Amino acid sequence: YANVDGFDAEAAQVPFEKCPEIDRWILSSLNTLIKGVDRELAGYDPTRAGRLIDAFVNDDLSNWYVRLNRKRFWGKEMSEDKLSAYQTLYTCLMTVAKLLAPFAPFYADELYHDLGGELESVHLDKFPVADEAAIDADLEERMAIAQKITSMVLALRRKVNIKVRQPLQQIMIPAVDDVQKAHIEAVAGLLKNEVNVKEVNFIEGQGILVKKVKCNFRVMGKKFGKLMKGVAAQMSALDQDQIAAFEKAGNITLNIDGQEAVVEVADVEIISEDIPGWLVSNEGNLTVALEVELTPELKKEGMARELINRIQNLRKETGLEITDRINVTVAPNEETDAAIKAFADYIKGQVLADSIEIGDNAGVETEFDDFKLNILV
């Protein structure tokens, strides 16, 4: 996309305060990374420094930032938003090339030159220095919560074999405090897009959720010794309000035969019982309930997304350029017919089609989960 758009890395930078929040987040994370790598190298721990770079590139840059921003690169003109996305990605990659230099000298040099590095070698350039003004710890915390919830919901989808392309109605979250709730509300729109749900709602208290505490005997046995039996009995007897308070505080103090025993959240596993039509996941002090029942309308939209996926694959297979417009004909089928009639404009917009019609054709036989049909592009 950058080559097609003629991106110029030397163009005037979009002011930091005008960058979208997602750009400011990755730049904040980048500068936090620089500080972390510098700290670990100064402490003679290159292994931890390398792992920080690996986590940033894989978890934050590739699997989150680039994936969330693909549509920003699709616009026909070089808008300020699009330029900000390119410049942000370029800054991240160039900085990573410099951070990588001590760990992967040859690859770092190749990446540096691919990005148009000014000097003969990355090893002659200055090592990155963190910009403290660009670091926003609150923003990083919000995005970390979004990443965590996304991971939990996607795991629940896999549990019942529901693809991400199939929209679901809602997730419900019992926030442990106002701070966590505010963080989640701030990223609700992003969450809806990323896990493909219509709504992100909050439960007052535990609502419909029933939680249980499961002790980790391997860890707790060493910690509490002879008190372990009493600790396990009291932990399993906690009611829903006590469990909620335990999650919020991060620990609970028990009295076992006149002796105090402090149990940390990390010592136990808090599990939630699944309820009809829902799946529930817990991780630390975060609980997410996913509604998995499918309405006819949700099924139609899911099929529309499946159709988009097949048409996009056909575009690639036929060697079309990313900017080429197409016309599409789909063979008659009850499921795809309903999806096309309900979501024709959406499908056309996603695959750059001027038209989409239902009719017999001599196109490519295309496989869906339960049937095959011809699609002509």
Mark where each language-model region is.
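Feature 926 captures the class I aminoacyl-tRNA synthetase adenylation module centered on the KMSKS loop
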Residues: 1-377
